[in-house]
Amino acid sequence: MPLHHQQFSEQEQFVLNVLNNKKNGYYVELGAAHSINGSNTYRLENEFDWSGVSFEIVPELHKEVSKNRKNPCVLGDATKFDYIKYFQENNFPDQIDYLQVDIDSGYKLNGRPQGNAYLSLHGLISVPLNKYRFSVITFEHDANMYWRNTAMRDAQREILDSLGYSLVVREIHEDWWVDPNVIDLETYRPFFKWNTL
């Protein structure tokens, strides 16, 4: 089944496809950036009634997301958040449907330019992956833009592979994963795409 190209993201369409257009799901979005067009969670929230939480560190982008979306958007550093407390207080299930990791705007770490600070990796390991599972994970590593990010790409692959996730889409700038305990091979097999190392 091909992904639909439109104003909404391919990641979001992938989530809907492999979860059979699930209603009332849950998402966690590290790096919200856009509230509607280009968002990886807008349709999930507005057309499929998903609950979730987004994180954005850039005040202007946070303001836009908060204005245009019903689910909360936290203004702050997604790498320093108490996820367990938040998930428990907001009744998130142990098996959360979607984790989106794309932290690359507004951060500077150790004086490095944006994108070279392994921030998406920091975000990924900040989430309690040993306590919560995610049915789908999309991870933007931007290895095509910053040569240092190939190490970040490889590290997230080792982490998620060791936790039993299956890599379905491997692109020059992002990876898409599924939990094979929740999504069977026949469902995600049509989406296999490995276009890069």
Residues of each region from the PLM?
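SAM cofactor-binding core of SAM-dependent methyltransferases
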Residues: 2-84
